[in-house]
Amino acid sequence: MDETRVMDQLRTLNESELFYRAYRLAKFSPSGFEAFIHQIDREQVRRLNLLVPEWPDTIQAEYLESQFFSPDRRVGIHVSKHNCYTPPVPHHHNFFELFYVLEGRCSHQIREHTSAMSAGDLCFIQPRVTHALDVSDESVVIDVLIRKSTFRHYFYSILQGDNLLANFFMSTLYSERGIDYLIFHTGDDPALHRAFVELCGEYMEKQDYYSVLVNAIVTKIFVLLLRKYMDACELPQDQFHDSQTAVRIARYLQTNAATATLGGMAAEFHYTPEYASRLIKQMTGQTFIQLLTTVRLENAEQLLRDTAMPVADIAAAVGYESSEHFIRTFRKHVGLTPSGYRQKKRA
């Protein structure tokens, strides 16, 4: 789909947006608004999942992956235009969100912080962070929702970098103390603009293998940000230190998963073992052994997907002396044997 057709579709108001525009216009007249609320078609509200703040049963505080993603784990990205005029309702979710102002402007609130966003601005939001987006006119804002598991499976190389973007995602994947948001001001960068238009076009058409191309375009967006905008990033500084500590520990365990011990990790960071154990529990909600097991199994998943190494060799490479113990542990946490996991990912 060419850029003109994509932009025409994005600029055309859909049924939900027409409702929300009428809702906003009605609010200018108290008497007119009361009449508007009384004549709302409840079937339309149900069918379109419309948000009507005056009807509490239409408001959700939490959104789950199952509401946006199919059970097919290969499709881990959902792309849509944020509906214009939607009432800005605070909410959170258990996946990552990225939104990009393609044209126009919007206002975004995260906890107590409000940002005015304009064309070219891009914002990453962590899971579990309460926020609200207000597109009060016919601006075009693109929403990209990304499963947490998608980062481990498809953006593994991005996570290996020592940069702010990688650390942002790592801090949530391995810690309960992540950075709430990152904002990039990219202005009229034509490469990013084209990438988001292409992303929307692919997702609208859903041709064969579209999910592969969607993953590739999102990777391209990440790379463009890494190349040009790491020094012009806005983030909550008060959360930076704790998140960096969590990331350093996670990276240490990724690199040394096969041989890591609590004592060795504590010595690396100049902690006592007791303090290191408490710190890991506070940051991740897991014990050292639980976190180490998580990292070892993620390393094993990557080797099963991307190499032809025998299962026994993978077990040894990630830190298991016994292949049988590795297979039992893998099956307990992943729900499949290592061979079954490899077969499923290559199907």
Please provide the spans of the model-predicted regions.
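N-terminal regulatory/effector-sensing and dimerization cores
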Residues: 68, 74-166
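Basic/polar phosphate-binding segments, predominantly the helix-turn-helix DNA-binding elements
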Residues: 259, 263-295, 309, 315-340, ...
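Generic protein-terminus/edge-of-domain signal
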Residues: 1-105
